[in-house]
UniProtKB/Swiss-Prot annotation:
Belongs to the PMP-22/EMP/MP20 family. Glycans are attached at residues 42, 72. GO terms for cellular component: apical plasma membrane. Its main location: other. The keyword Transferase does not apply. It comes from Mus musculus (Mouse). The gene is Cldnd1. The C-terminal region is required for localization to tight junctions which occurs in a TJP1/ZO1-independent manner. The keyword Secreted does not apply. Keywords: Cell junction, Cell membrane, Glycoprotein, Membrane, Tight junction, Transmembrane, Transmembrane helix. It is a multi-pass membrane protein. This is Claudin domain-containing protein 1.
Length: 253
């Protein structure tokens, strides 16, 4: 194996490892999208009901999004979280202080919720199914797992290439990384489109702002790393095979 190809192979492996770590961290964390709003310092009856609805198993899209808006919510692929006061005061609001303790409460999406239809008017089951948002939601949480699976399968093939001391299997590894990058890019695109469509239907309150979080950024960084790793794997395999063919033809001649 030529030193150039070995160097390209090692660099591609490093890029692949980094992108896999980023993708796994992105899938496992809850900061794809974050909302910023004034923290509700008191725990009135209405606030308690909102928290219970948010943490319930049957919360619809409109219900949990309204709570996310009001309580500094964060949204991941599998969980939704809100920030609420740690100490509740049912009789009266606490005195205003410079800071107070808060706690984060999270609720996981069930598989039924992940595959549940989205409605034209969120929360209104009689408004008809919004097919675009429904399939965008399903793709945004399925594609990252497909991407991660392709990366792991490509790593196994790369390991076989090392054992066989051959660069030929790395062509398949490169193709798998290319497909993984496309899946990651598709997931990010679906997530952005889904968030924008949601905010067109459910407007944010005036004192609430939203932004993409660091989990989303990790997924965005992972995609180009996968593409670069794929390019190096494919280049190393293709060029090495081409030089081997030329060398074989020269020896025959």
């Amino acid at each position: 194996m030529d030193n150039r190809f070995a160097t390209a192979f090692v660099i591609a492996c490093v890029l692949s490892l980094i992108s896999t770590i980023y993708m796994a961290a992105s899938i496992g964390t809850d900061f794809w999208y974050e909302y910023r709003s004034p923290i509700q310092e008191n725990s009135s009856d209405s606030n308690k009901i909102a928290w219970e609805d948010f943490l319930g198993d049957e919360a619809d899209e409109k219900t949990y999004n309204d709570v996310l808006f009001r309580y500094n919510g964060s949204l991941g692929l599998w969980r939704r979280c809100i920030t609420i006061p740690k100490n509740t005061h049912w009789y009266a609001p606490p005195e205003r202080t410079e800071s107070f303790d808060v706690v984060t409460k999270c609720m996981s999406f069930t598989l039924n919720e992940q595959f549940m239809e989205k409605y034209v008017d969120p929360g209104n089951h009689n408004s008809g199914i919004d097919l675009l948002r429904t399939y965008l939601w399903r793709c945004q949480f399925l594609l990252p797992f497909v991407s991660l699976g392709l990366m792991c399968f490509g790593a196994l093939i790369g390991l076989c290439a090392c054992i066989c001391r051959s660069l030929y299997p790395t062509l398949a590894t490169g193709i798998l990384h290319l497909l993984a990058g496309l899946c990651t890019l598709g997931s990010v695109s679906c997530y952005v489109a889904g968030i924008e469509l949601l905010h067109q239907k459910v407007e944010l309150p005036k004192d609430v702002s939203g932004e993409f979080g660091w989990s989303f950024c990790l997924a965005c960084v992972s995609a180009p790393l996968q593409f670069m790793a794929a390019a190096l794997f494919i280049w190393a395999a293709h060029t090495n095979r081409k030089e081997y063919t030329l060398m074989k033809a020269y020896r025959v001649a």
